[in-house]
Regions:
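Non-cytosolic membrane-interface motifs at loop->transmembrane helix junctions
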Residues: 121-131
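Membrane-interface helix termini and inter-helical loops of multi-pass transporters
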Residues: 45-48, 120-123
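Hydrophobic cores of alpha-helical transmembrane segments in multi-pass integral membrane proteins
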Residues: 15-43, 51-85, 89-117, 130-131
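Extramembrane terminal tails and long inter-domain/linker segments of multi-pass membrane proteins
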Residues: 1-14, 46-49
């Protein structure tokens, strides 16, 4: 049985989650390349890197590539599989969730630049501790 296409606002939210998933992977790659460049001997002393930039960049890389990507793909698959009921408009809660996820992704991507923060390199999910 072929289901009918969902309404346009629903497709826009699904598209937003797909863009967030791809953007999280791109930022995760950048969050790995830039801290790795901070360990190159020619660049190590030429650029004033923040304190513990490599460790905090590694935390940001893992959080973006593991947590944000998986949750964005989960939202994408869930919204694709579950059709919104006709009597409710899922646009507002769906858009609010997407906006909050984008803001959280930007906060994770900017976390290595926070001064005074300390990277806690745990086994599975590392975190950044800030007083």
């Amino acid at each position: 049985m072929i289901l009918p296409m969902p309404p346009e606002p629903h497709r826009t939210i699904v598209r937003g989650w797909a863009i967030l998933a791809v953007t999280a992977l791109a930022l995760a790659g950048l969050a790995l390349i830039v801290p790795a460049a901070s360990k190159v001997p020619a660049l190590q002393n030429a650029v004033a890197w923040p304190d513990a930039f490599f460790q905090k960049g590694l935390v940001s890389h893992v959080a973006l590539s593991f947590i944000v990507w998986f949750l964005a793909v989960l939202a994408l698959i869930s919204l694709t599989a579950l059709r919104p009921p006709d009597r409710r408009d899922p646009t507002l809660p769906g858009a609010a969730g997407l906006v909050l996820a984008v803001l959280g992704t930007l906060a994770i991507a900017g976390a290595p630049l926070i001064r005074g923060a300390e990277a806690s390199l745990n086994n599975y999910i590392p975190s950044i501790i800030h007083p």
